Each structure stands twice: as structure tokens, then as C-alpha cells.
């Protein structure tokens, strides 16, 4: 089974406190669907294209699990804490097998 990756590119964060509350609430929810955090902010360099002030990447055991997590009521309730003061692009991308 191929893993899938949840990639959030934040375009604008108007309220850091709301984003922090969102992260605190949704982290255990995402983990309950098998999500593993790979990138959460941190030092970065923009070498080409647009700069995003924050990037978050989660790894999931499958595309289906990533979608179930995103579509769950629990996650959507958590996202409601930040969505009015945050603008982001979110993609769920299936990885490839190296075997």
C-alpha cells in the first residue's frame, strides 16, 4: 500500500494564537488516523517561486486514511478554530513505491 502525504502551504496567518489552538486540537486527531508529522514550520529557504510563511507535511499509511481524517467531523471542527484567520493550500498526495 502506498503512503500518502498531507501538504499544507500557508499563504497567510493573521492570528498565530488561533493557529496554535488549531494545531493543539487537531494533532491527536490526525495521529488517530495514522498521521505522522514530518514537517511543521521550521527553518526554510525559498529558492524558486512563491514564499509560504509556514509549511506542514503529514505522512499517512494510505490515501484513504488521509482523506478520512480530513473529512472527519472531529478534524473539521478543529479546523474551524483557524480557518477564518488563515489562508492555505492543502493537498493530499499519494506517494510512490520504491520496491
List the model feature ranges, each with a label.
Residues 67-69, 74-91:
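C-terminal structural segments of small proteins and small subunits
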Residues 1-54, 61-71, 94-99:
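Short S/T/G/P-rich N-terminal loop/turn motif that feeds into the first structured element of a domain
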